[in-house]
């Protein structure tokens, strides 16, 4: 990660110019180390101090993050510097981040600082010539506003997250430090860098713990003495962030902030290191940009004996807490990790995004967004999510304790990084070993010899003896087939056994596979003596004898499979919609029962039909499985009585039907409800001759039937019936869906056919059954003369019969849509007749068809049939003239 240093100084009084000769080169360090007098803290002096301190601390052999992908190697780390200084009533700020060149004696930054200091000095001298009262009357708030705006402009030029580490050094005035309210704008700009850019703030001063206590608390800054501020920047820091531990099952997460990784100088370099730097002269790899994650994620605890030695690298780092850390939980975690010594380690991963191009600064972290966010006055400051595009990779680190709150982080090679490098390192190790054998060293190095236990030696000798017996039998067999004497001489037998032993030790592993795998983790000095007397690495013998365990085979995966695995890791904590409804799918997915051909044929007849009824698969969803009733089939379920069927459990059966035709009752009730809801707002016809009791009317009143545009359509009614029946099937368990709120309709006409909806209280289903007309009973109860009552009764009954017959015959002959078509044709005919286009006219057929189509096109958008007849007339009258002219013109052309 690149390092960005920001120097912020708040000083009073007069600047001492470096160009004036008051400070000689090299004396600024002694002036700071002395405590007798106030040191001369100009921006140039501080820059020289930091540059010299960083240059002395940087070691070229310190460990850095290597390449984590095949795209290329990361760019070398760079250092940048910027300054924002306030002196009296004047301030200046760097316009951009300037790169620090440690190999140059003087760089561009010094020229910029010198020019700014001279400008500031001239401004201060001008102020001294003016009156002191006018100088004090200058608005100090505007000065801090201007300084804050300059800092915001610098923050907008920072790279994307994960690319830079920012260190801010604040040097306030010791005599009269500003209060928090006065310098709030510039402190807010520093807060922006602290929260959204993960900057580290250091306040240096003699009495800053007292004078700048509130500022330090607001910025979570560490306070150091003035003499130690140059040591506050640690050049060995490669990464700063937090440690995250997640609980995948419940989605819990805990963070430990203020951790850092530091590079260390390697003490020894192994010959079997997977680094292929010796090819760097021939192959020039491309440069890429690394964007590191903000957190070191915990993976698992690991036993060192279970970790293959080929995955270990020689690159090591130090994990520590940042300087002046005050987080107790972070200190406690560091103590726990530092106690991991010996056989156990903690495995962590540092995410990294690799990009071929430099990603521009994101707009989500801009100063404008910060001002808008702080204007809302949030209780807690949250960092916006920024998506860095590129190749997703990471570094696996094995953490082990070093004591005294220090941890060693060893870099592990991933499967993609070890591809091919393992075999290459083995070959390289062989070459070095053979070259070293030419010049033997004394005394003899016994550590290079292999170490075996007693059981392993005995097992090897037993295998060798059996192998020699087989070789001897084969030799006798061949001599007999060649008609040679079977007798062996002593020299021939000795040479045969020696050759057999040599071939056995040269081409076969003397250890079993399990023991060989265990030895690779525990035995450090491994080698096998071959026929040439040279020492072979133990890993090469492992690679020859057990190819299935080669590390290269772990990376021979399909790209699509790896992408699916990454997608599952990203979305593994989020439940799917089907799992939210049905529960998590428990049990292995690949647990399929495979049948032989004979076993499969047992379940089918000679015709290819199944032997028995098909049974549903037992699929467990959730914690409570759906237990099926044993020996139950659809045929058996149909003949069971209701009491027994309701206690059974069968796949797909949500409810059972009783013996009282509940489905027909539901259909009748839905038909009744659909009619009531459809025609509940229509008016009724009343007569004052005699009252009729109020009933639920499933049919429309005669007044509704008399209107041609309000005749109920039979097809639509049947469609609603089917819809309601299917809806009741789905909602049969919800009693509130079966009993919607009913509306009462008064039917006081003697011409209507009354009916009554009956409700059975013993069952959960309602039905409406048509009954005989009750008008006779209602009328007979009135105090009327007997003759008139009988006449009225006979008239009423005959009128009801005629109305019922005419209505039923009309519904059987003509549907609603057919009636609307007939009505529209009659309206079109009458309209054309008024315009002197009768049936005898030659253009009557064309005009009527054209006017019918146009009128039908305009009438199809109507949402209700009320007033349909008037709309037909209006539409036909509006379009009849245009239709006649169009038809006449068309016929004249013919």
From Swiss-Prot:
Keywords: Cell cycle, Growth arrest, Phosphoprotein, Ubl conjugation pathway. It comes from the Eukaryota. Pfam families: MTBP_C, MTBP_mid, MTBP_N. Residues 762-772 have a biased composition (Basic residues). One of its GO terms (cellular component) is kinetochore. One of its GO terms (biological process) is protein localization to kinetochore. Disruption phenotype: Death between E3.5 and E7.5. Mice containing a heterozygous deletion of this gene coupled with heterozygous deletion of TP53 exhibit an increased incidence of metastatic tumors. The modification Phosphoserine is found at residues 591, 633, 697, 701. Transmembrane segments: none annotated. Residues 563-587, 701-822 are annotated as: Disordered. The keyword Membrane does not apply. Residues 802-822 have a biased composition (Basic and acidic residues). Residues 750-761 have a biased composition (Polar residues). Expressed in small intestine and spleen at low levels, in the ovary at intermediate levels and in the testis and thymus at high levels. The keyword Phosphoprotein applies. Residues 515-894 are annotated as: Interaction with MDM2. Coiled coil: none annotated. Belongs to the MTBP family. May play a role in MDM2-dependent p53/TP53 homeostasis in unstressed cells. Inhibits autoubiquitination of MDM2, thereby enhancing MDM2 stability. This promotes MDM2-mediated ubiquitination of p53/TP53 and its subsequent degradation. Inhibits cell migration in vitro and suppresses the invasive behavior of tumor cells. Interacts with MDM2. This is Mdm2-binding protein. It comes from Mus musculus (Mouse).
């Amino acid at each position: 990660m690149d390092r960005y240093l920001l120097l912020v100084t708040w000083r009073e009084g007069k600047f001492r110019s470096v160009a004036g000769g008051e400070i000689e080169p090299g004396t600024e360090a002694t002036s700071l180390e002395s405590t007798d007098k106030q040191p001369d803290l100009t921006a140039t002096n501080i820059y020289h101090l930091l540059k010299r301190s960083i240059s002395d601390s940087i070691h070229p052999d310190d460990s850095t993050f290597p390449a984590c992908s095949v795209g290329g190697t990361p760019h070398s780390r760079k250092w940048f510097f910027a300054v924002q200084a306030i002196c009296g009533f004047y301030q200046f700020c760097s316009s951009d981040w300037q790169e620090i060149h440690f190999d140059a004696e003087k760089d561009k930054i010094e020229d910029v600082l010198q020019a700014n200091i001279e400008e500031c000095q001239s401004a201060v001298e001008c102020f001294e010539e003016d009156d002191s009262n006018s100088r004090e009357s200058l608005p100090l708030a505007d000065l801090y506003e201007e300084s804050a705006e300059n800092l915001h402009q610098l923050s907008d030029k920072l790279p994307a997250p994960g690319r830079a580490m920012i260190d801010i050094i604040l040097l306030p005035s010791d005599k009269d430090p500003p209060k928090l309210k006065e310098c709030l704008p510039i402190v807010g700009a520093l807060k922006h860098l602290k929260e959204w850019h993960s900057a580290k703030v250091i306040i240096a001063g003699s009495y800053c713990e007292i004078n700048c206590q509130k500022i330090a608390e607001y910025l979570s800054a560490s306070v150091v003495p003035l003499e130690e501020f140059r040591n506050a920047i640690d050049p060995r820091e490669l990464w700063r962030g937090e440690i995250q531990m997640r609980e995948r099952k419940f989605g819990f997460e805990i963070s430990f902030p203020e951790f850092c990784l530091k590079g260390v100088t390697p003490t020894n370099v192994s010959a079997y290191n997977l680094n292929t730097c010796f090819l760097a002269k021939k192959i020039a790899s491309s440069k890429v940009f690394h964007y590191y994650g903000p957190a070191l994620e915990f993976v698992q605890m690991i036993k060192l004996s279970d970790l293959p030695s080929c995955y270990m690298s020689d690159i090591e780092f130090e994990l520590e807490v940042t300087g002046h850390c005050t987080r107790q939980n972070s200190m406690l975690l560091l103590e726990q990790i530092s106690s991991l010594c010996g056989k156990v380690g903690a495995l962590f991963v540092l995410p990294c995004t690799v990009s071929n191009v430099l990603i521009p600064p994101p707009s989500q972290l801009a100063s404008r967004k910060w001002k808008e966010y702080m204007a809302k006055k949030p209780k807690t400051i949250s960092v916006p999510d920024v998506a860095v595009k590129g190749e997703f990779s990471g570094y696996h680190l094995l953490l082990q304790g070093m004591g005294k709150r220090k941890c060693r982080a060893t870099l592990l090679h991933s499967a993609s990084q070890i591809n091919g490098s393992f075999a290459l390192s083995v070959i390289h190790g062989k070459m070095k070993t053979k070259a070293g054998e030419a010049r033997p060293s004394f005394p003899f190095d016994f550590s290079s010899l292999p170490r075996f236990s007693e059981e392993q030696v005995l097992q090897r000798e037993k295998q060798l003896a059996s192998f020699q017996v087989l070789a001897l039998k084969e030799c006798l067999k061949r001599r007999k087939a060649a008609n040679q004497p079977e007798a062996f001489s002593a020299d021939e037998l000795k040479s045969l056994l020696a050759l057999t032993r040599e071939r056995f030790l040269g081409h076969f592993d003397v250890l079993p596979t399990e023991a060989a795998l265990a030895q690779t983790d525990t035995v450090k000095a491994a080698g096998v003596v071959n026929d040439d007397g040279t020492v072979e690495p133990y890993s090469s013998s492992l690679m020859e004898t057990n190819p299935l365990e080669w590390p290269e085979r772990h990376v021979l995966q399909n790209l699509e499979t790896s992408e699916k695995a990454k997608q599952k890791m990203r979305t593994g904590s989020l439940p799917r919609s089907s799992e939210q409804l049905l529960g998590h799918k428990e049990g292995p997915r690949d647990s399929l029962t495979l049948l032989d051909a004979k076993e499969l044929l047992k379940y089918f007849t000679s015709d290819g039909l199944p032997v028995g009824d098909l049974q549903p698969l037992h699929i467990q969803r959730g914690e409570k499985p759906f237990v099926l009733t044993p020996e139950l089939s659809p045929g058996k379920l149909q003949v069971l009585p209701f009491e027994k069927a309701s206690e059974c459990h069968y796949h797909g059966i949500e409810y059972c039907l009783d013996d009282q035709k509940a489905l027909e009752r539901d259909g009748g009730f839905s038909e009744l409800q659909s009619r009531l809801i459809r025609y509940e707002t229509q008016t009724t016809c009343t007569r004052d001759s005699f009252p009729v009791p109020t009933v639920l009317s499933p049919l429309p009143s005669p007044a509704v039937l008399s209107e041609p545009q309000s005749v109920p359509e039979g097809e639509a009614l049947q469609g609603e019936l089917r819809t309601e029946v299917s809806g009741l099937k789905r909602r049969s368990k919800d009693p509130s869906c079966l009993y919607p709120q009913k509306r009462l309709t008064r039917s006081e006409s003697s011409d209507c056919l009354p009916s009554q909806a009956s409700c059975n209280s013993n069952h959960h289903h309602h039905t409406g059954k048509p009954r005989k007309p009750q008008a006779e009973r209602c009328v007979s109860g009135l105090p009327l003369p007997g003759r008139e009552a009988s006449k009225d009764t006979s008239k009423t009954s005959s009128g009801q019969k005629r109305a019922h017959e005419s209505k039923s015959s009309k519904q059987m002959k003509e549907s609603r849509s057919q009636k609307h078509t007939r009505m529209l044709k009659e309206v079109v005919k009458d309209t054309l007749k008024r315009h002197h286009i009768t049936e005898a006219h030659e253009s009557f057929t064309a005009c009527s068809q054209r006017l019918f189509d146009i009128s039908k096109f305009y009438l199809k958008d109507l949402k209700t049939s009320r007033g349909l007849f008037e709309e037909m007339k209006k539409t036909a009258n509006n379009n009849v003239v245009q239709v006649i002219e169009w038809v006449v013109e068309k016929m004249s052309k013919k």
